[in-house]
Amino acid sequence: MSGKYFEATDQNFQAEILNSDKVALVDFWAAWCGPCMMLGPVIEELAGDYEGKAIIAKLNVDENPNTAGQYGIRSIPTMLIIKGGKVVDQMVGALPKNMIAKKLDEHIG
């Protein structure tokens, strides 16, 4: 099931991701990154699957360099799982949906 992910920015990251009471999966990506484009549909599917249970977000590193820099993002795509305002897990690369979901499930509930 496809859903709408949250578009995270330098401006809304604190309020919408860090201050949320839900677990968040944030995909750090760029338009010029081939593996990022491959991961896009997976993120949309996860947004539908986890609607109401977790925040599924994407953050464009070119448009939002402050947040990407703050988290030391060097390779993209990088996905961070954030819970209670802290990074609790990290994944790098265009991973399959089931691997991402398994990691996310470990931090929900």
Curated annotation (Swiss-Prot):
Keyword line: Disulfide bond, Electron transport, Redox-active center, Transport
GO biological process, one term: cell redox homeostasis
InterPro entries given in the database record: Thioredoxin, Thioredoxin-like_sf, Thioredoxin_CS, Thioredoxin_domain
Any GO molecular function: protein-disulfide reductase activity
Pfam families in alphabetical order: Thioredoxin (PF00085)
Cellular component annotations (GO), alphabetically ordered: cytosol
Domain Thioredoxin: 2-109
Disulfide bridge map: C33-C36
PROSITE patterns: THIOREDOXIN_1 (PS00194), THIOREDOXIN_2 (PS51352)
Family from the record: Belongs to the thioredoxin family.
Function: Participates in various redox reactions through the reversible oxidation of its active center dithiol to a disulfide and catalyzes dithiol-disulfide exchange reactions.
NCBIfam families per record: thioredoxin (TIGR01068)
The name this protein goes by in its record: Thioredoxin 2
Biological source species: Chlorobaculum tepidum (strain ATCC 49652 / DSM 12025 / NBRC 103806 / TLS)
Gene assigned in the entry: trx2
